[in-house]
Design a protein with these regions (language model features):
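Solvent-exposed alpha-helices and their adjacent loops that cap or buttress functional pockets
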Residues: 3, 49, 102-103
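Polyanionic/metal-chelating signatures
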Residues: 86-197
Length: 197
């Protein structure tokens, strides 16, 4: 973008509300003003692939398919790396499971705020994603003997897992359709792994 000399950045409720030359940004009466003459103002940096602040390892290595595990459960909110990242201008991180699994765990998108609990760092109303690793990483992760050990095995693991997830969803769809007709039905057994997929 363009450099704005003699500009104003208006922040309301912790978010940038307006940016522009001083003459074009209306500053509300009573607003706190910070003279940043000679300084640079940049938006916060986003780290789209982070393993920051994971405590106790970021891979669930005993199985190649683990979408039921959640990174938020192992976030160390007191890790100094969070403070250092924030001091360096990083405001948001996407903390991911490691790459040892064909289908790994659920990510956590965190808004960095020093002194807050892990749950307080989580963005509200954000759908979690699941980390996938293809090819070499999952087949090289051989801390324990487990399948897959070839690229063919990695690809099959994906196909099989998605087929099982589709079958699981179909059972729940059938259950919901039956209930919507006013018929009592026995709910399928809940499976957190397939639910995550």
């Amino acid at each position: 973008g363009n450099i704005i000399s003699g500009g104003t950045v208006l922040i309301e409720n912790g978010k940038i509300a307006a940016v522009g030359p001083d003459s074009q940004v209306a500053v509300p009466a009573g607003a706190r003003e910070i003279d940043a003459t000679g300084m640079w103002v940049t938006p916060g940096l986003l780290d789209a692939h982070s393993h920051m602040s994971i405590e106790g390892g970021g891979n669930e290595g005993a199985d190649s398919v683990t979408p039921e595990v959640r990174i938020i459960d192992v976030i160390n909110h007191r890790d100094e790396s969070l403070f250092r990242a924030l001091a360096g201008g990083v405001t948001t991180i996407n903390v991911l499971h490691g790459s040892a699994n064909t289908i790994g765990g659920q990510n956590a998108i965190l808004k960095l705020r020093w002194g807050k609990s892990a749950d307080e760092l989580l963005f509200d109303n954000v759908t979690r994603g699941v980390k996938f690793a293809l090819g070499e990483n999952p087949k090289r992760a051989r801390a324990v003997e487990r399948y897959p050990s070839t690229r063919m095995g990695v690809e099959f693991t994906l196909r099989k897992s998605f087929a099982e997830a589709r079958e699981y969803q179909a059972k729940w769809d059938e259950y919901e359709a039956t209930r919507s007709r006013g018929v009592d039905a026995l709910a399928p057994r809940r499976d957190l792994r397939l639910e995550a997929l």
